[in-house]
Amino acid sequence: MSSPDFESLSLSAPVLKAVKQLGYEQPSPVQAQSIPILLDGKNLLGTAQTGTGKTAAFALPFLSKIDEKQRSPQILVLTPTRELAIQVAEAFQSYAKYMKGFNVLPIYGGADIGGQLRSLKRGVQVVVGTPGRMLDHLRRRSLDLSQIEGLILD
């Protein structure tokens, strides 16, 4: 049995276009197993070694389901470090390259909270951040979680 290709995984057209442009040819095993489950709206606990494509395994299906016109966060990604928050946010941005009106915001301590507040006010669909800064925004009531459709603990 051959492994699926990205076209057969039911990703949205803009996400699929970005995947192709990034040079992805075949989904990794973790991607091939995870993407259909997440597109179906099911919960998933996925574990795999570093470098196996875990970020794409959760980012691609969630991006395929995002409403680009909605300005409040729909996807929340919690990461343990600022470095990982930045890396994951950059990955989301590259996979969403052809999604008009898409915005992702990395939020973490040590960065200017004023800029984060302005970005949240303008509207973002994906928030990627560390628990401490997320709690800070929740206490300030600057982070609206009422429209969250997906939560990722990375």
List where the protein language model places each region.
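Conserved nucleic-acid-binding Ia/Ib motif block in the N-terminal RecA-like helicase ATPase lobe
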Residues: 14-17, 21, 71-139, 147-150
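The conserved Walker
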Residues: 48-52
